Amino acid sequence: MELEKLIKLLKDNKELNVGVRLGILLGLYYTRSAWFKELLDATRLNKGELYQHLKILHKSGYVEIKYIPTVEGKRLKVFITKKGDELIRQVLELLREK
């Protein structure tokens, strides 16, 4: 059953047991990258909470965090990695199956 496979996949990747982290990865799957400010607005978390979630995703290899110089100074940008991309692809395939 696909539901069992999906639950197992999420349990095996405990970092995704928190809905906001799964949501961040799903968003990055479609956008490929996002500025920290964009993620703040989308998640409605405070800066500290969001940064902690991103650190966990980064430590797990699902996202890459880069500080990029801009006219306004260095800004944090988050990119989905190949590992994150593959995981979300598996999640979406399981959701599509009937």
PLM region descriptions:
Residues 1-9, 16, 26-30, 79-98:
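Amphipathic alpha-helical dimerization/coiled-coil segments
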Residues 7-49, 77:
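N-terminal helix-turn-helix DNA-binding core of bacterial DNA-binding proteins
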Residues 54, 70-73, 86-89:
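Short, structured secondary-structure boundary patches
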Residues 54-60:
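Basic amphipathic alpha-helical segments that dock to polyanions
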Residues 60-73:
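Beta-hairpin "wing" of winged helix-turn-helix
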